[in-house]
Amino acid sequence: MGVMGGTFDPIHYGHLVAASEVADLFDLDEVVFVPSGQPWQKGRQVSAAEHRYLMTVIATASNPRFSVSRVDIDRGGPTYTKDTLADLHALHPDSELYFTTGADALASIMSWQGWEELFELARFVGVSRPGYELRNEHITSLLGQLAKDALTLVEIPALAISSTDCRQRAEQSRPLWYLMPDSVVQYVSKCRLYCGACDAGARSTTSLAAGNGL
């Protein structure tokens, strides 16, 4: 079972294509998208969890292999990957988990809370733009100690799209069409997300906590 972790603020085609490609590559029956509750690593305001959850549900609804989990949102407190995987293991004890995230995030995996346990809970898939190289010396050293299939890097051309760019375009009233599903574009517009001062009520403030996570 694939596990697609992220803030999804907002979700876009890069996320969806990455999940689809990983599912095909590893012959996965299902990919569960898990919007983070309170992502401790984000040094900016993030949209309220319910907005991010609903956008993810809307974006994935048409693919029968995709589903969305609330485990991180409903747990409360900062979101740590080890808790995400432990909860999903409890819910799906017979499934082998493939945790998918950005390759750039994996470069700092040794700073995540309980990182030593992570590779016992799941296989990791780092998705990246074509040409990306995992250069962090700590993760490069770690790779030599892991089983061959513990961590795989996969190039995804659609990852040239980023949530940061989508937010900036919305703030500048620039078009979001063809960067994300039409239904998500309409949701962003209807709820007035990412439009500067007008969306203060749609935001929740998170600060960098003294812990580790994704």
UniProtKB/Swiss-Prot annotation:
Protein name listed in UniProt: Probable nicotinate-nucleotide adenylyltransferase
NCBIfam families: cyt_tran_rel, nicotinate (nicotinamide) nucleotide adenylyltransferase, PRK00071.1-3
GO terms (BP aspect): NAD biosynthetic process
Disulfide bonds: none
Gene: nadD
EC number per UniProt: 2.7.7.18
UniProt-listed Pfam families: CTP_transf_like
UniProt entry tagged with the keyword Cell wall biogenesis/degradation: no
Enzyme type, top EC level: transferase
GO molecular function: ATP binding; nicotinate-nucleotide adenylyltransferase activity
Organism whose genome encodes this protein: Mycobacterium bovis (strain ATCC BAA-935 / AF2122/97)
Pathway named in the protein's UniProt entry: Cofactor biosynthesis; NAD(+) biosynthesis; deamido-NAD(+) from nicotinate D-ribonucleotide: step 1/1
